[in-house]
Amino acid sequence: MYGQKIDFKNHPYGSLGKDNLLSANTSIGDIDNDGDVDIAVANGRHWSQFNQIFYNDGSGFFRRSKFIGFEANTSYLANLVDIDNDKDLDIVVANDRMKNQIFKNDGKGNFTFDAFFGRQISNTRGLCLADLNSDGFIDIAEANRKTQNFIYLNDGRGRFTNEIAFGDSFEATINIVASDVNQDGNLDLILANRNKQTNRIYFGPAFKDFIYFGEGDDETRKVVVADMNQDGFDDIIAINV
């Protein structure tokens, strides 16, 4: 096996936030529409902390930051996505044992709480943000560990009131990605399951039929799709512990 050696240099101001942050994930994008990439950080996991935005000053330094919202959360994800098709990035937050949240962007990188979605008891570990019903709007697939997984369809205004259960109520799902696995023109959902449960692929647009993949006790934490052998088909990379 041959690899390519690439050296990375430490950034002189390479640390973000404080030492006591229990960060679970980051999402990057141009939050304030100034042409550079900013960072949203999900903090807390099982313990409530404030999620945070770090603004790029244009030279790769992140001296300015803001909290997302006015209360601490048990967050696993703070994903940047244009949820209401207004050409700016909003934030969708996945929480553990708390309802998930949507924060709308005013176009200048200022965020206002907009709505909750999901159930209070959901142990959300992951969110897949994709147009699952091919109507031009971003929908949400919710990965809930040891509770029911749900799909929330966007009504075109960034509202998610249509709740659709999929899979088994006991699936210990950690991560979901969308890909047209069988190339039928519909996105499918690829699930990473832990607790010695086999990973699954649910076929769209109904997300009822599924197949297994993996060894059955992989303890998968994340899945990624890419055309690894350049044959025109998405392959799956599973990250296991």
Task: Say what each PLM segment does.
Residues 2-21, 55-73, 104-122, 153-171, ...:
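Blade-edge motifs of beta-propeller repeat domains
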Residues 44-48, 98, 147, 195-197:
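Short glycine/acidic-enriched loop and turn motifs that connect beta-strands
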Residues 24-33, 76-85, 104, 125-134, ...:
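Beta-propeller blade termini
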Residues 16-33, 39-41:
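Beta-strand-rich domains and repeat architectures in extracellular enzymes and scaffolds
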Residues 122-130, 136, 142-147, 171-178, ...:
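Solenoidal tandem-repeat scaffolds enriched in leucines and small polar residues
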Residues 34, 38, 86, 90, ...:
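Acidic carboxylate motifs that coordinate Ca2+ or other divalent cations, activating on Asp/Glu
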Residues 39-44, 91-95, 140-143, 189-193, ...:
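Hydrophobic beta-strand segments that make up the repeating blades of beta-propeller
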